[in-house]
Amino acid sequence: MILRFRSKKGTLRAEAQPTDLFDVAFKKLTEDLPDIDPATITLATSPTGKQEPASRLLGKTVQKLGLNHGDMLFVSYTDSAPRAAVEAVTAETAPQMTAAHIRDATKQLPVDDYLEKQDGKIKRQLSALQQRKFGSRGMGEDTLPVDPWDEEYLKEQKIKHMSYHAYVKKLNSQANKKNGGGYIAPLNVSDFGVSKSCTGAHAPWPEGICSRCQPSAITLQSQPFRMVDHVEFAESGMINSFIEPWRQSGTQRIGWMYGHYEPYELVPLGIKAVVEAIYEPAQSGEYDGITITEITQADGQPQPPHIATAEACGLVPLGVIFTDLVDAGNGDGSVICKRHADSYFLSSLEVAFAGAMQARFPNKSRWSPTSEFSSKFVTAVISGNPKGEIDVSCYQVSEQCEAMARADLIEPSINPSVLLVKEATKTRYVPDVFYKKNNEYGRTVLQGANPQLPVDYMLVTLTHGFPQDPRPLFSSGLSSFPVENRELIGVTQSPQALGKALDSGSAGGAVSNFHLLSYIQSMGVLSAEEFQLLAKVATEKKDEDVSRLVASEGWNNLLLIIQ
């Protein structure tokens, strides 16, 4: 049936069934009258009849309201400001209030809270000549402290990427002057998907789209900052233990890195990821790749043992580490160098995987309009270096790469140095993608990336190393208890192995092993409180906690099981 609406802009029509709610016809009316305030609409059955607020008719069927095919309703309303003007006002006011609220409400990592309070200014050392010239307290222009994002200083120190907090302070100095007006979130979160909150007069995507809700063309740029500057492995034995399955079987290995973040003094306002444990999920290793077979956690199901163990020990997921090793066949332990400047550093498959993982582990930030910005999740590769030695390399992918992964725009190719931009479908909108390159005349030009895209534009390199004075969180030694999921090389976790490990030393020292803790957690013998106490014993090693653990019911039940 057709209902007619007479307004000062003419007669409008809306189609509805007798059993439909009046809301169906009202929605069509408001779409045909976009520049009005819907809250002011009133309806009458005659030009001089009593006007009824339209809101009172909503929620009732057309039939119940006594409306028939061809009936005409007379519409009155108040004109509102043009939509563009309303959106302009909203854009100027609402985001400022929202950004300030998000800034104050967002809970960041402790390392971020600490670093954002530091000014990061770099003090220059005075030469003997400058000390004679200016005195101990005097300063010339070339001896004043410099900002942590100073390009000349970073170049002098051979720092390729400024730190995340230096980047935030640089943007903040431009966006929010000390005596300026309202607060503006300095970080810009890339979003290459179709807007789902478009106010245009069309059906939501994928049924409809307009120039306001479709994403703009993407111009890829090398990222000038990095979210993490350095990866520190708590002890070198951790890497040796991780590559042992490759040494015995020749197959590759993957693991999840757990640890915490600390300030990194060698980069202004830098952050380092300190790896305390590597958990090896269930996997099927091949000579040239890996398939993770660990069952994904279902909604409402208990957390996997390694995640629950990490949380109990105060650790967070830091990243992923995997091997790509091929023996050189020289009989001296040397390996083939596959990754270098003339081939690739991370393959397109690995870049796509890293982008998806970083999008899965977003970084909380008070300086983002969404409370999240990029990720601190890192990717570490153990492979051969140009000297034929086994070495570690650490990377992240850019924030733009994360956004492209979220929007389902990229996929790997058979060429390891080239990503592919996916084709558009009915449900996937693909904007134009460009990147800058030097042409045959040495000029910088924009190159279309549809469909191929060099992976170099996505990579951010990190440094790595080991502490000079190792003080690992877990002290029982990596050989004290079998590592999980190593059945391929004849290594199995069992109650007998647990009993042997616990008999090897004091309770406090014997349980200080991440793999042992994860195994105990998987047994389900200890209560949540008892396991939390066990984790505290393993990480803090206090005598009073050991006494409480030994006296607990769950611990004694565990000892009975493994006897």
Curated annotation (Swiss-Prot):
The keyword Electron transport does not apply. Pfam families: NPL4, zf-NPL4. It is a peripheral membrane protein. GO terms for biological process: cytoplasm protein quality control by the ubiquitin-proteasome system; DNA replication termination; endosome to plasma membrane protein transport; mitochondria-associated ubiquitin-dependent protein catabolic process; mitotic spindle disassembly; mRNA transport; nonfunctional rRNA decay; positive regulation of protein localization to nucleus. It is found in: Cytoplasm, Perinuclear region; Endoplasmic reticulum membrane; Nucleus membrane. The gene is NPL4. This is Nuclear protein localization protein 4. Keywords: Cytoplasm, Endoplasmic reticulum, Membrane, mRNA transport, Nucleus, Protein transport, Translocation, Transport. Belongs to the NPL4 family. Residues 231-373 form the MPN domain. One of its GO terms (cellular component) is nucleus. Involved in the import of nuclear-targeted proteins into the nucleus and the export of poly(A) RNA out of the nucleus. Has a role in the endoplasmic reticulum-associated degradation (ERAD) pathway. It comes from Yarrowia lipolytica (strain CLIB 122 / E 150). One of its GO terms (molecular function) is K48-linked polyubiquitin modification-dependent protein binding. InterPro entries: MPN, Npl4, NPL4_C, NPL4_Zn-bd_put.
